[in-house]
Regions:
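Two-component/phosphorelay signaling modules centered on CheY-like receiver
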Residues: 12-31
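Acidic, metal-coordinating helix/loop segments flanking the phosphotransfer/catalytic sites
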Residues: 32-50
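His-Asp phosphorelay/catalytic-motif detector in bacterial-type signaling
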Residues: 47-49, 74-79
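Receiver (REC) domain active-site loop signature in two-component systems and cognate sites
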Residues: 57
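C-terminal output helix
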Residues: 108-117
Length: 124
């Protein structure tokens, strides 16, 4: 089954590396967004199987974007994995309290990114 993943990250390099990894290694369809607002629109339009969401973005950050996704009945069911460069113990609790499916860390290994996502979401 071909999966569709939405990657929401303000860093072009991260979007490109993650997108290329998921397309070539896993054969998944990838949709890209460079901001929380664009991500909300693309999530509603493309109905991805999961969303990889950066925590630190200008404007609408990852946690705010996540809450907005959950408010919309069209996107409220989509699993979300946060992507972050740094996590302190207070952040881990905050992310767990949000209700995200998982948190992955930058830098990630492009060769194992799809395996990590599949494991976190029980797609194996």
């Amino acid at each position: 089954m071909t999966r569709r993943i939405l990657i929401i990250d303000d860093e072009e390099d991260i979007r490109e590396v993650a997108g290329l990894s998921l397309e070539t290694v896993a054969g998944w369809e990838v949709v890209l967004a460079d901001s929380g607002a664009q991500g909300l629109a693309r999530a509603a339009e493309h109905q991805p199987d999961a969303i990889l969401l950066d925590v630190m973005m200008p404007g609408m950050d990852g946690p705010t974007t996540f809450r907005e996704l959950r408010k919309n009945p069209i996107t409220s069911h989509i699993p979300v994995i946060l992507l972050t460069a740094k996590v302190q113990s207070t952040d881990q609790k905050r992310f767990a309290d949000l209700g995200v499916e998982a948190v992955l860390f930058k830098p990630f290994d492009p060769l194992t990114l799809s395996t990590q996502i599949s494991a976190e979401l029980g797609w194996e």
